[in-house]
Amino acid sequence: MAPSLSPIRSHHVAVIGAGAAGLVAARELRREGHSVVVFERQKQVGGTWIYTDHIEPDPLSVDPTRSVVHSSVYGSLRTNLPRECMGYRDFPFVVRSGVSESRDPRRFPSHGEVLAYLQDFAKEFAIEEMIRFDTAVVKVAPAAEEGSGKWRIESTEKEKKKWAHRAV
């Protein structure tokens, strides 16, 4: 006789970042029945694919009070992988009918097209409802209760907050 599988226990799980990996992790964790919160420091999903033309006022990092620009994307960036390799298995990265004509149908899309794909994915699977935007994680550490398996997360929104989650 085959051993019986015990049901998966639902946990409170934190995902840090709403980029490509964070979005699919959040979706899969929720599919498994977990309570998921995604911490995202930006105002939108997309992670590294969010483009800004802002530059740091102090590129040598001399001023410790400088504003820091988090972007590795430049204006003319195109992917070096074809879109067929970049999509999720059950949500292909194809040009969708009925969307804006400004979408980029080329095989090696621009950063804007990748960002739009990730935004479409988040909408399709209602992931945005799990995301705390404008929330930077500043510290993750095991919770004080030894053996609890929980993690303490400190984040900044308008004020510093602390959260306890089973997995991070």
Curated annotation (Swiss-Prot):
One annotated GO molecular function: NADP binding
Binding of FAD, residues: G17, A18, G19, A20, A21, G22
Enzyme Commission number(s): 1.8.-.-
Disulphide-bridged cysteine pairs: none
Database matches in Pfam families: FMO-like
SUPFAM superfamilies attached to this UniProt entry: FAD/NAD(P)-binding domain
Keyword Calcium: no
Keyword Cytoplasm carried by entry: no
UniProt cross-references to InterPro entries, sorted A to Z: FAD/NAD-bd_sf (IPR036188), Flavin_mOase-like (IPR020946), FMO-like (IPR050346)
Keyword terms, alphabetized: FAD, Flavoprotein, Monooxygenase, Oxidoreductase
Cofactor(s) it depends on: FAD
Similarity comment text for this entry: Belongs to the FMO family.
Function: Catalyzes the conversion of methylthioalkyl glucosinolates of any chain length into methylsulfinylalkyl glucosinolates.
This protein's name: Putative flavin-containing monooxygenase FMO GS-OX-like 11
Source organism: Arabidopsis thaliana (Mouse-ear cress)
